[in-house]
């Protein structure tokens, strides 16, 4: 999509220009995003279902194709109100520039990404607490299943447009097993949101996601990145200190400081963080906010967020 909201022009022989339904079912309407790993399209379900997001591997080789297959495998295994749901998957058989590429069909989130929320306005602390409860609940479910997302950042967190579960985590292409070793020559994550140990190439751990989510929440609440500057400046800064958490954030300060502790053993689990975030939601009776946080295995059960949110137009990231 272009900046003014009009559909980007489709290259000749592309799936968008062909007018031929993908798998005989999904009629591509517009391109929503394009990145180095994939293109994302909005498509109509000709069998009467709601519109969906179609994610097709970018041209370029094995790495891009493997990310799509990896994401499909993760989404097929995990179901949670705050994890985007998988609808279908396959390989593009329509002739043209997309032929032979793997694709997946996902639930279409109808809201903005957190990256767009940060650019547009600073959301209320109550809304952020509501979102955090759902997102940490989703991470707890993922971690209990032995996986780590590895690329938690504003562009990979979406508003769904739904009241009962208003947030979604997307893009599981670089998810990896807990305690696995980094692949030589394969980078994961986004520099400005990596934990210090992820940036140094340590063993994959759930604490990576917890730290990254802490930086995202801090940015939502303050409007600025915790570690600005170039990639190198950002990486060096986090190896020397924890991010600054302004005192004006009040009750958020203890949570944010624990999430972004330099020592990963001092961070809460995602399940504990979900309970801590729930206690920051205004107007929610204490009995509904969850029990006090207790150290232990992340809770794999659903933790749906609730409450009404402003409707925003979807712009999914590739």
Task: Please place each PLM-identified region on the residue numbering.
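Activation segment signature within eukaryotic-like protein kinase domains
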Residues: 131-132
């Amino acid at each position: 999509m272009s900046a003014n909201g009009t559909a980007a022009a489709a290259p000749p022989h592309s799936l968008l220009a062909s007018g031929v339904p993908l798998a005989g079912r999904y009629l591509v309407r517009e391109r929503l995003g394009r990145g180095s790993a994939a293109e994302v399209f909005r498509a109509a379900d000709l069998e009467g279902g709601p519109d969906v997001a179609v994610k097709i591997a970018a041209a370029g080789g094995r790495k891009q194709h493997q990310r799509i297959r990896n994401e499909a495998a993760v989404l097929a295994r995990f179901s949670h109100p705050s994890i985007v749901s998988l609808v279908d998957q396959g390989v593009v058989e329509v002739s043209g520039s997309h032929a032979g590429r793997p694709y997946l069909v996902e639930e279409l989130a109808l809201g903005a990404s957190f990256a767009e929320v940060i650019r547009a306005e600073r959301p209320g602390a109550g809304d952020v607490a509501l979102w955090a409860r759902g997102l940490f609940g989703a991470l707890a479910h993922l971690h209990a299943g032995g996986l780590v997302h590895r690329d938690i950042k504003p562009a990979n967190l979406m508003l769904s447009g739904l009241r009962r579960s208003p947030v979604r985590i997307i893009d599981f292409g670089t998810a990896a097993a807990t305690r696995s070793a980094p692949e030589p020559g394969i980078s994961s994550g986004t520099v400005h949101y990596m934990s210090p140990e992820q940036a140094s190439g340590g063993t994959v751990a759930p604490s990576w996601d917890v730290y990254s989510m802490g930086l995202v929440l801090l940015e939502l609440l303050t409007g600025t990145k915790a570690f600005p500057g170039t990639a190198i400046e950002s990486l060096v800064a986090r190896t020397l200190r924890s991010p600054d958490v302004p005192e004006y954030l009040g009750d958020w300060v203890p949570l944010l400081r624990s999430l972004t502790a330099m020592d990963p053993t001092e961070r809460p689990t995602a399940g504990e963080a979900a309970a801590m975030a729930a206690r920051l939601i205004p107007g929610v009776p204490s009995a509904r906010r969850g029990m006090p946080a207790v150290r232990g295995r992340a809770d794999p059960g659903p933790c749906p967020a609730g409450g009404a949110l402003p409707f925003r137009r979807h712009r999914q990231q590739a």
